Amino acid sequence: MLDSLKVTPRQVTGSGPAAGQSTLAPAPELPEPAVAGWRPRRQNARRVLALAALLPLTVILAVKAASLGTQVFVNAYGMGVLGATILVMYVSFGNYRDPSEDATTLTARPLVSCLVAVRDELAVIETTIRSLLNQTYGNCEVIVVDDFSTDGTREMLTALAERLPFTFIALDRNVGKKRALVRAVEASAGAYYVFTDSDCIVGADAVERCMLAFQAHPGIGAVSGHARALNSDKNLLTRMQDVWYDGQFGVSKAAESVFRSVTCVSGPLAAFRREAIYNYLPAWAGDRFLGAEFRFATDRQLTGYVLGQYWIGRKLKHQYQNSPFVSAVDYPERKWGVAYVASARAWTNVPDTFGRVLRQQTRWKKSFIRNLFFTGAFYWRRGVLASALFYGHGLWVLLAPLLAFRHLVWLPLHGQFLLTALYLGGVLLKGSIWGLAYRFQNRGDGRWIYRPLMSVLSATVLSWLLIYSLLTLRRSVWSRG
């Protein structure tokens, strides 16, 4: 065990009736198996042409802005952002294929360890556990680690573990999400790991879809599922985030998956081969940045070890050679692929107040900064097009607050309101392109209209959080919002 994990856990292994028979509460109604309602996306010329047809509009917008005397750099940035958006969609809609579709049935069912770290999630954690126990895959073990909850979560889980078949570990001090999950791995026996956040519901067939992808593609070391907002109907903010989630997974991750280089296997549903991450867990749990422990970047950082281990793995294992995660077994460094499985579904509770959105986005931007230094150091080796997506996105995020200041503050102060209007028009255009993509993937769903609103919120408010995140980078608190 890692030195910093030397806590005194209390462990309870459930041996009671199966899920659905708890005497504490009836089993919640779970969404139907994801694949049952999912429409596979093949190469579709009409969709590609519809998206590509927007490219001339992007050029016209840039030319018009240039004719008004703005700087070449600013025009190139705006044109680049819109052009890159269309390129990502072209790659996604024209080339993505769900890797789980390449295997019709499972020829074997090795043990899968489903792992959850929880802190103060009394209202939702039982639902999360039940969704894992209800998996169609069958051969799963569920391990839940409580990271020193103070809201009654620990007591509830202690009682629940006597009635449902899962292993519960209670830590006697708060160690952070990464270290709590490493403790779960130590107690596991599976050849594959499935992580989910403690406020999520995992589709009944999600583990099976991930395992089909692993079986069909031995070179894939990790896969991300598809996440939507569980509480999307609550208010305007949750609906905006739900539509945004759909695009981030169904378009952005799909495009990265074409190159087998998904940069973030996200928390709602993240699956890994044991051999792809086991040796790097001490480096992950003990990650330090700018001289301090860095508790964020849990998903991105772990994905980075899969993507980059061929180039950085040996050095990391040497650094942690005394850890049992390295000394007990030494897996070879491989050029693993990382993919996205669209038919593996999960639902997560998104922030439902503006303050919670800001706190979550701040946490994510801190993770982005850390990941830019870590993954950015080797990602260029993943190929030209994959690298263009990664570094182009990084450049866009870094420049976004500067462009927002210029167009929303500096130019209006100097009376150039037309340029501000053009900037906001470009933001709305970009959001509308994403909204169109949402319509393509969700026929008959009118929520696409919320996507342009999310783009405006991101450009005018959320982009500024990058500066605040930089200033508070060393402040590390595990909080969901």
Model-derived features: where do they sit?
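Short, charged juxtamembrane terminal tails flanking transmembrane helices
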Residues: 477-481
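Non-transmembrane catalytic domains and loops of membrane-associated enzymes and transporters
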Residues: 2-16, 24, 104-379
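A general structural signal for short secondary-structure boundary/capping elements
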Residues: 268-273, 288, 386-394, 407-408
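Loop-to-transmembrane boundary segments
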Residues: 36-47, 380-395
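Membrane-helix boundary/interface segments in integral membrane proteins
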Residues: 20-38, 375-377, 404-408
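N-proximal low-complexity "stem/linker" segments adjacent to membrane-targeting elements
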Residues: 24-127
